[in-house]
Amino acid sequence: MSLADLTKTNIDEQFSSVALENNRRSAECKRSPGTGDFSRNSNASAKSVDYSRSQCSCGSLSSQYDYSEDFLCDCSEKAINRNYLKQPVVKEKEKKKYNVSKISQSKGQKEISVGKKHTWNASLFNSQIHMIAQRRDAMAHRILSARLHKIKGLKNELADMHHKLEAILTENQFLKQLQLRHLKAIGKYENSQNNLPQIMAKHQNEVKNLRQLLRKSQEKERTVSRKLRETDSQLLKTKDTLQALQKLSEDKNLAEREELTHKLSIITTKMEANDKKIQSLEKQLRLNSRAFSRQLAIETRKTLAAQTATKTLQVEVKHLQQKLKEKDRELEIKNIYSHRILKNLHDTEDYPKVSSTKSVQADRKSLPFTSMRHQGTQKSDVAPLTTKGKKATGNMDRKEKSTEINREIPHCVNKLPKQEDSKTKYEDLSREEKHLEVQVLLENTGRQKDKKEDQEKKTIFVKEEQELPPKIIEVIHPERESTQEDVLVREKFKRSMQRNGMDDTPDKCTAPYTKGPLRQRRHYSFTEATENLHHGLPASGGPANAGNTKYSHSTSKHLSNREEMELEHSDSGYEPSFGKSSRIKAKDTTFRDKKSSLMEELFGSGYVLKTDQSSPGVAKGSEEPLQSKESHPLPPSQASASNAFGDSKVTVVNSIKPSSPTEGKRKIII
């Protein structure tokens, strides 16, 4: 308010100074009317100077107190308005004075004419002053209004700034409150993080305590429930006893106590006897079940053994079938030309038909052997001479074992114990089981030995086949078979027959395999044209084929010598009673006659001459053909030619693991 008062006083002083100057100038004009223009100019200049001064003073005041104008209030505005109202009042007074002076001058015109002139000049001067004053007043009014307008704008800005300040202050207060709250929350969070392990430990302890309380409460509930059940059961029992006692008390037809006690004792004895019987029956059932389980186990073992035996037999059969197929293929590959010639010869009527089936070949090839019931004794005594005979005996022995097992199963089933004599029969069964187990062990050991021997023989057979050169058939003279081997074979055969008790009926258990006298091999000599045709050469052969013809003649000679030696050996060898040797001996002469006649018909008299030339070479001994065979092996073409009119196949049989060291490779040519 002090600044506003200062501004009011300054404005009043300015207006008062202006009014005083006007009065003084008017007085001066009255005093010096002659100098009107100069005074006017001077007054105007003074007034202009004063106005400039007033402006300067106002500017200085505004420059000095510019910061205080922003803080003017309504009271200062009211004071300024009052000053503006006072100014027209002063002007009206001046006008009245001017009018009064005019009136006074008009009254004194009559007296003083000079005075009239001065009044006229003064009135003009006053009118000019009045115009200048009005102009100044308008300028001042405009300046003041602009200044007031500025002041009002500044006041409005001040008010806006005050409002903004107030809003900012409130916002600051709210933000400070939020900051305090955030700080408090952050402090709590940090404290909670620091106190987390403690809180967790407290929580875990509380959980443990609660669980312990739960367990205790559950245990208490269980005990209470048990007690309740027990009490309920006791109550029911007591109720039942009460009802029974009430019934007894109500019954009037009761017997005496002695009779009742006697009846009770009898009933108790009967109950005890029944309990004992039940216990004894249970024991018997247990024993019977054990016996049955053991018997079932034994039978299952036997069945498993039989199944394994059948599987092994099936595998062996398949293996043998494969071997037979392979041998058939090899023979077909070797004897291509012989098959073609045989087809042509079978068509003729005079030629005796030859059946070259596998069964006939097996009968011809097989040497005498026996099929034994127990494999252990057979292996220790007899070593078979051929692979097929060995496998056939093994098959027969395994079949006999399977039949024995099938016979023993019903025998054991019939020996099941009854309820009366369970203990004694159980002991007998245990003994029988032990005996059967021993037999099974012996059979297993025998089978293992069989397998080992079979493997050894197979390895030896493979080695011997590998040692032999391909496409060469070695023929070893049968004189290498010593008489000792024949004696050993006879003794072993007799022992086996005595052990098995099969002397009376050998046809039932043993297969009648016989070694009859070997058939004579048919050897034919051909002309050069036919031999060349067999070899695939042209019929008209030159001197180059002479060596082959000589070679064929020599081989035919050796073969004829060998056949004669075989016939001699077969006459001196062992021949069983159930063989067919006598029939073959009777047919030898007729067969030779037929052969000679047939060859004459086919090839003419040249073949007979060649056979006559080759006959004296037989007396040279049995060693020459062996040496010639070893030094000159048969070529495959010559072998096929020699087999053309004989048997269709040449089979080579190696003895597997011979019984004596002198026994070597044995080959039978059919």
From Swiss-Prot:
Name any Gene Ontology BP term: intraciliary transport
Pfam families named in the record: Lebercilin
Q: Show the coiled coil region(s).
A: 148-259, 305-336, 420-440
Disulfide-linked positions: none
- Name the segments for region: Disordered: 24-44, 351-402, 495-520, 533-594, 606-647
Q: Where is the composition biased (Basic and acidic residues)?
A: 560-572, 585-594, 621-632
The protein's UniProt keywords, in alphabetical order, are:
Coiled coil
Q: Where is the composition biased (Polar residues)?
A: 368-380, 546-558, 637-647
Q: Which GO terms describe its cellular component?
A: axoneme
Similarity remark: Belongs to the LCA5 family.
Please state what the protein is called.
Answer: Lebercilin-like protein
The record lists the organism as: Papio anubis
Q: Gene that codes for this?
A: LCA5L
